[in-house]
Amino acid sequence: APGWKSLPDEPGTADELLAEMDDHDVGWSVLVQTSWSTWDNGYIADSVQRFPDRFIGHGLIDPQDPNNAEVARYWMRERGLVGFRLHPMYYPDEAILVSPRNDALWEELAAADAVIQFHMRPSDAVQVDEIAAHFPHMKLLVDHMGYPDLEAEPAAYQPIVDLASRDNVFVKISDVAGRSTHPFPHVDVHPY
């Protein structure tokens, strides 16, 4: 996130995660650089290098960095990351994903078959749709269901639903409990 340099409230190491995975018979995990971090993906990359059979790494990439295509190439080729998370919702005054200054980035990511995750709101779906159409072989993931607003009309969420027409767009339902105001099974989120 632009200018956001906070740290997690609790420590969490790759070794701790690996122990939890072993305790619960989890074979492998995708490590994703936290969005409230810096652009340095070093810890994720180091963890993937230490445990290549257990971890896959996704980093952050700065969409405002004029050299982001080269940066992405470095993290993928030299450090072993396989994808990135981008945050269009942090740039409300700009269609940052489809800005011409990021054309080289998208070409680099597509050539590497990178998997891309998006922290986004429904208003950002038009950008993801454009990328999905231009790069139909790339896997694109909508994080946290696109943060549906349960107080808004369901039509406000329609841009996320419309992404279902793209074979290469997937939605992670990781925020059901976080969005819901009801106990499990969180029926207020079911329409989304």
Task: Label each PLM-derived region with a short phrase.
Residues 1-104, 108-112, 163, 179, ...:
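Mid-domain alpha/beta scaffold segments of enzyme catalytic cores
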Residues 82, 96-192:
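Catalytic pocket-lining loop regions of alpha/beta-barrel enzymes
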